[in-house]
Amino acid sequence: MTVLGGLGAVFSRDLSRRDIYNGMMARHCYGTTGARIYLDITANKVRMGDVSNSSGPTNIWGCVHGTAPIEYIALFNRSRELRRFHPNAETRDMNRIKIIWSGATHQDRGRFMKWDGGLEMNSGVIMGAIPLNMYTAKYGIDVLGERHVTWRSITSGQEEGILIHINASDDTVIAFEAGPAKIKFNVGEVRSSNLRWDLGGLDQFVTASTLHTDDNTFDAEFDYIDDSPVEGEQAYWVRVVQTDFHRAWSSPIYIENKIRKNL
């Protein structure tokens, strides 16, 4: 398990204690999982953390400078995802399967969750395997065989996983057993669609996919027009996810939407 301390960034008029404090109090700030990602977002030309009014569509603009290739940028209004941007194209590679797991036992300290386990195929060959988001000698792949892989992993909310390169038919069955998960699926299933298993607990899940982000774009801008006629307070914010599993989250921009009524 490798969990870095998070970073906070503040938009400040000047590099002074007072201006940094004012920027924080105005919510002109965002957080990351530890990477020095640059993130900016505006809605109707007001910046993150601000409160404004609108009687029409909301024009949203954002800019990201990552420290690794960007997997996606997700734009939300409160908990509802409005749009997902992919600066790097996603492509399906039928012979590479990415399996991700995550979760925690509870919200307090000591919430670590063990995912020691492995997977096995009933036919075909595993050509190679790469641990994902495991960077310490204590965790990672233990055994790589022709049809099985075992590993040691522990999460406390972050995602970890494994990328396997296989030569197998669609009928091949993969049996995955780690943490609370005991899962079986056909290779043909994951080749045709992304798979997800929710395991309860605190955001405990496993996913499997043949979709991959292999391009190398670190920087992106995006635009979106929200012309939803919903009345009331809107809260627009952005989540950035990189291929190295680092993330960034903006503070919300609050827009009070007052719908014009025809007289």
Predicted regions and their residues:
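C-terminal functional module detector
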Residues: 1-263
